[in-house]
Amino acid sequence: MNTKRIPGFQWAMMIFIFFIVAYALPIILKDLQSSVPFKDFVFDMSTLAPFIAAFICIAIFSHRGTQLASLKLTISLKVIERAILALILPLIIFIIAMVCFNIFSDSFVLLQTKDLSVSISSIIIGQIVMAFLVELGFRSYLQHIVETKMNTFFASIIVGFMYAIWNVNIAFSFDFAIYSFLYSFAFSMIIGELIRATKGRTIYIATLFHFAMSFGLVFLFNEELGEVFAMKVIALSTAAVAILYILISLIIRTILYFFTKRNLDEVEENNYLDHVNDTDEDLTDVGDEYNVSETDETHHSANVNAATAETSSEVQDKEDPTDRHHESNASDQDNQYNSTEDTAHEDDSRANIISENTPSPSSNDSTKVDAKHSDSRANSAVEASTEKAHPESDQDEVKVNSRYTSNRQSSVVSDARTTIDEESDESSRHLSSESDDVTQQDNQPLDTADSSNADYERSPFDLKSKRGHRS
C-alpha cells in the first residue's frame, strides 16, 4: 500500500471528477469521429477521454508529485517479466476462446472482421495509440490514486467497475451489454494484477496487454457487429483467465511470504498480508518504548537528586567559613570598640586624677604641668585672666585663643606654642599672676569637667594627640 497519503476529501474528488470527465467526454468526441479520416477500429476519438480527464485532475489538484508517481518511463527486470506475461495472457485467452468457439459453434473462420480495407500497420499503430491513451488515464493515474488509500487488489476491483462502466457497449442487446461489462471488468482485473509492485512503471505493461487484446478482437472475432455468442465466448474466456491468474499469483505470494520468510516489501509493495501483524508489533514497540522511558526517568531523577545533594553540601561548606569569618570580624570590631571605649574612659580618669591632685600654682613648674594637661577651655580661661592683666601686650595672643575657642578645631601644636609663650610671660610677671591664680583655682573644677566631656566626644585621633603631650 502506498505510504504517500492524499487528504480523504481530495482523494474522493479526484476519483469523482476523473470518472465524470472520462464518461462525459466520449459523448462530445463521438461527434468529432466523422471529421477524422480513420475507422473506429483504427482510432476511436473516445479513447482521448481518460487522458484528458487525468490531465485535468493533475492540473487542478495539489500533490502533483504523488499524482505523477505512477507515470515512470524507466524499465526494470520486473517490468520486462510482466511485459512478456502481458503478451502471453492474451494468447492464452484467444486460444481458449477459439477452442470454445469451435466446440459450441458450427465453424470458426479466421479474419471474420468485415470491411477490413486498411493496412495492418495502420491498425497496429492505431491500436497502440488508443491503448496508451486509455491505460495512461485508468491504470497509470486512476489506479495509482485509488491505491494510496487501499490495497492493490481492492483498488483493481474499484477501477475495474469504473472501467467496465466506461467501456461497456450498450448499442446492441442487453445480453451483449452484460457480457461486454464482464469482459471489461475481467480485462481490468488482469491489468491490475500485472502492474502490481512495479513501482510506477505501469504504462508499458498495461499498453502491451491492451494492445494485444484489442488487436486479437479485431482480427479473430466479430463481436463489434453485435454477435452475442462471440462476445459471450470472449467474456467467459477472459474471466476464467483472470480468476486463474489472480489465484496463482496469490498462492505464489503466500508461499514466498510464509515459507521463505521474505519481507513482502521486496516481493511487492501493496500486499494486504503485510499489515496482518501490524497491531501486535505496534503494541510491542509501544511497551518497549514505555519501559525504556520509565528507566530513563528513574536514572534522571536519581542523577538530579545526587546533583542536588552535592550542590547543597557545597553551598553549606561555603557558608560555614563565611559565617565564621563574619563572626570573627564582628567580634574583632566589638573588641576594638570596647578597647577604644576603655582607652577613652582611662584618659578621662587620668585627667580627673591630674586635676584633683594639682598643687597650688605658686611655682613655675606646677604652672607648666597644668598648662600641658589642661584642655583648650582651661587654656582659654587662663588667657582671659592674663588678658585682663595685660591687655595691650598680649592682644595678639588673646585673638589667637579666642579664634581657637570659637572654632574648636585648632591643632595641638598651636596650643603648645601658645602655652610656652604664656609661660614665658607669666614667669616675668609672677607677682601680677598670683592674684589671678585664685580666680583660676575657682574656675578650674568647672573647666576640668568640661574638658573631660569634650575629650569623651572627640575622636581617637585627638586622644592619641593628648597622650603624646603627656610625656
Swiss-Prot record:
Region (Disordered): 294-471
Record's keyword annotation contains Transmembrane helix: yes
Transmembrane intervals: 9-29, 41-61, 84-104, 118-138, 152-172, 175-195, 202-222, 239-259
Entry-linked InterPro entries: Rce1/LyrA-like_dom (IPR003675)
Biased segments, Basic and acidic residues type: 315-329, 367-376, 385-400, 455-465
Subcellular location: Cell membrane; Secreted, Cell wall; Cell septum
Presence of keyword Transferase: no
MF annotations from Gene Ontology: endopeptidase activity
GO cellular component annotations of the record: plasma membrane
Biased composition annotated in UniProt, kind: Polar residues: 301-314, 330-341, 352-366, 402-417, 440-454
Record keywords, A-Z: Cell membrane, Cell wall, Membrane, Secreted, Transmembrane, Transmembrane helix
Membrane topology: Multi-pass membrane protein
Gene Ontology biological process terms in this record: CAAX-box protein maturation
Similarity comment: Belongs to the LyrA family.
Role noted for this protein: Involved in bacterial cell envelope homeostasis. Regulates peptidoglycan processing, perhaps acting as a scaffold protein.
UniProt name for this protein: Lysostaphin resistance protein A
Designated gene of the protein: lyrA
